[in-house]
Design a protein with these regions (language model features):
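Hydrophobic alpha-helical membrane-insertion segments
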Residues: 11-27, 88-106
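Interfacial non-cytosolic loop connecting adjacent transmembrane helices
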Residues: 106-126
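Cytoplasmic membrane-interface segments at the C-terminal ends of transmembrane helices
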Residues: 1-8, 31-32, 70-90, 106-113, ...
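Membrane-helix exit/juxtamembrane interface segments
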Residues: 20-39, 106-112
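Alpha-helical transmembrane segments of integral membrane proteins
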Residues: 2, 6-14, 59-63, 85-89, ...
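Alpha-helical transmembrane segments within multi-pass membrane transporters and channels
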Residues: 65-75, 93-96, 100
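Hydrophobic alpha-helical transmembrane segments
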Residues: 52-67, 124-147
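Perimembrane loop-to-helix junctions flanking transmembrane segments
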Residues: 34-53, 118-122
């Protein structure tokens, strides 16, 4: 049981580190939309700017897909003989990795859009806050981590059945 706990903590720690390292990548891949302050003090953006708001979420999901697959593969390699514990460790690791990426990305900034726009002068261009706009994007990381676990366990089960020369048959009535 101690070995399972150690391996689980290792997988979880690796996930958190991967999430923290993914945040600067996420930040560098996103072009934040901007608002331009007019002479009357009103802030406006373009139609393209409105659609770019969701590029932050889409890029986060794309990075989560890659990091989740890495976490799932690492979890399988380290915990393939541990059964459901490996799946649980991969799931927790992926969720914490996603949250670490989100947290570090928001810390990198920018933030305080309302304050920045309020103190802006006419003609200034102010980027929106760097933020994730939906928590559902975190689930991409979790699902991506489960895919390698499911595929590898399916292939391992088939390999095991072919080695014994027996295929499991269902008994029908």
């Amino acid at each position: 049981m101690i070995a399972i706990l150690r391996l689980s903590l290792l997988v979880i720690a690796m996930g958190i580190v991967l999430g923290g390292l993914a945040a600067p990548l996420w930040h560098s891949m996103v072009t934040l939309p901007t608002y331009t302050v007019g002479s009357d003090g009103a802030a406006t953006t373009t139609e393209k700017g409105l659609t770019q708001v969701f590029s932050t979420d889409a890029t986060y999901c794309l990075i989560g897909l890659v990091v989740g697959l890495i976490i799932g593969c690492l979890s399988w390699v380290l915990m393939r003989r541990r059964g459901a514990w490996g799946v649980l460790a991969a799931g927790i690791s992926a969720c914490l990795s996603a949250l670490a990426c989100w947290w570090v990305g928001v810390l990198i900034g920018p933030d305080s859009f309302a304050e920045r726009i309020a103190s802006a002068k006419s003609g200034e261009v102010i980027p929106i806050d760097f933020a994730l706009h939906t928590w559902v994007a975190v689930l991409v990381w979790l699902l991506a981590a489960m895919v390698p676990m499911l595929i590898a366990s399916l292939l391992a089960a088939r390999r095991g059945a072919s080695r014994t020369g027996r295929a499991k048959t269902s008994t029908g009535a």
